[in-house]
Amino acid sequence: MAKTLDSPGVLVVDFGGQYAHLIARRIRELGVYSEIVPATSLDALGEALPRAAGVVLSGGPGSVWGSRHDEAAAMVLQLGKPVLGICYGHQLLAKVLGGEVGRSPLPEFGPTEVEVLDYGILLNGLPSRFKVWMSHYDAVLRPPGEAKVLARTPGSPVAAMELWGRVFGVQWHPEVRHTQYGREVLDNWLSLVGAPRTWRPGDMVSELVESVKKEVGDALAVAAVSGGVDSTVAALIAKKAIGSRLYPVFIDHGLHPEGEVERVVKLLSRLGLEPVMVDAGEEFLAALEGVGDPEEKRRVVGRVYAEVLERAARDIGAEYLVQGTIYPDVIESGARPGADTIKTHHNVGGLPKDMRLKLVEPLRYFYKDEVRLLAEKLGVPRELIWKQPVPGPGLAVRVEGPITREKLRIVRRADAIVREEVEAAGLGGKLWQYFAVLTASMATGVRGDSRSYGYVVAVRAVESVDAMTAKPAELPWWLLERIARRITSEIPEVVRVVYDITSKPPSTIEWE
């Protein structure tokens, strides 16, 4: 890890809410390093608290009355440093300090207008009314005795409060981009925290290089490269750290999008990362035969990938594996205690625990946009920096149900059509991801004068900043029609094309 709370920063105590990592991300955007610790681990919390300049209590999915988090909140308050409670964290502060928390007279979800009653430090410089993002059934009905009520809404009589000039709570989510003046609220609080605003991930190449150099020592290492920005940046950092003792390895698992292998090899070679090529497509397909469960697919791909990689590393004599694991990978794999596993990430949960290689993950605590800043410093071409992410298991998780050669051929071609048309329309650089999914559904169609029965392809295109949340892209109707026409014309097995308009949450970006 490049940096920890060994130097002053903000600690985000995670109560299991979906936005805990957005809080950390927004604080980093304001120049202050932030880390997350689960509220379920009091030992980890106790160890981290003394090093924090300020603490944020995150949102959470439950009620403060059914929780066991009072002790965690008490530990934070005893620290005597600036505290900010958000949503659940706001209610928890009110509860442990003697306020009243109960069912809101008007549960609020989505955009809500907040009325400022007293600006205090937290709301300084904001208008008297503005829109915020709410998501709560419970509310603070009566503030703690010494608290000053800063704001209210129809469903939250104590929508914001201040105690002793250092403890604050807000019922809304300032970290969500739908909230007006959310950045200003966090900025005001950080001004009180006083932590140094020195978090500039783009300037941390040298620090990361030294960290890898120290970790690997004189040993040999392999870098698992996929051609994505994460694995490429991790490999470049390792290359700078240990030079010719790094061996980039590209495993062709037979699950790549159309033209991906050739494009990746060309780009990596331009960067001085000439990869060791391993063709293992038949091995992966054999292992995936009959496997339909998405989690099992990821585990199978991870297991076979590790086996192939270990064989390559053994031939090379390497002891270390450099991976491009980033923060959202860790989150979605449920690597934090108390969080539900959304899906096993190939980089995190798919690798066996008994793998012989020692893991080196220089980007484990960075978000995607921070990795892109590092990539710019390292001279990575823009076409790779802004290349849309491809899941580690590749097209295996873009085919619902068991994988066959026919299904891979269909989804590979459909995906290529989506990419070609989106990019021809000049929208490629404006979208986070755009791809095709071969669904498990079948539908009736018409070919000529005859009834046909074939596959349904789903098209997915989303806008996002950090992959933590995403919204469906509003693609032009003519573009969607053109994509559907091409897919059904060029792939006769497909009779229907649908467009996925679901946000994340509640869905994930990938279907599996």
From Swiss-Prot:
Drop me one GO molecular function for this one: ATP binding
EC code(s) of this entry: 6.3.5.2
For this protein's source organism, the top of the classification is: Archaea, Thermoproteota, Thermoprotei, Desulfurococcales, Desulfurococcaceae
Q: What is this protein called?
A: GMP synthase [glutamine-hydrolyzing]
Instruction: Provide the Glutamine amidotransferase type-1 domain boundaries.
Output: 9-198
Organism of derivation: Aeropyrum pernix (strain ATCC 700893 / DSM 11879 / JCM 9820 / NBRC 100138 / K1)
- From the UniProt record, list the reaction(s) this protein catalyses: XMP + L-glutamine + ATP + H2O = GMP + L-glutamate + AMP + diphosphate + 2 H(+)
Q: Where is the GMPS ATP-PPase domain?
A: 199-387
What is the name of the gene encoding this protein?
guaA
Task: Note the InterPro entries from the entry.
Answer: Class_I_gatase-like (IPR029062), GATASE (IPR017926), GMP_synth_C (IPR001674), GMP_synth_GATase (IPR004739), GMP_synthase (IPR022955), GMPS_ATP_PPase_dom (IPR025777), NAD/GMP_synthase (IPR022310), Rossmann-like_a/b/a_fold (IPR014729)
Give the record's keywords alphabetically.
ATP-binding, Glutamine amidotransferase, GMP biosynthesis, Ligase, Nucleotide-binding, Purine biosynthesis
Indicate which residues the UniProt annotation says bind ATP: S226, G227, G228, V229, D230, S231, T232
Q: Does the keyword Cell membrane apply?
A: no
Q: Which domain of life is it from?
A: Archaea
Its top-level enzyme class, in one word, is ligase
Reported function? Catalyzes the synthesis of GMP from XMP.
Disulfide bridge map: none
Q: In which pathway does it act?
A: Purine metabolism; GMP biosynthesis; GMP from XMP (L-Gln route): step 1/1
Pfam families named in the record: GATase (PF00117), GMP_synt_C (PF00958), NAD_synthase (PF02540)
Q: Where does the record place the catalytic residues?
A: C87 (nucleophile), H173, E175
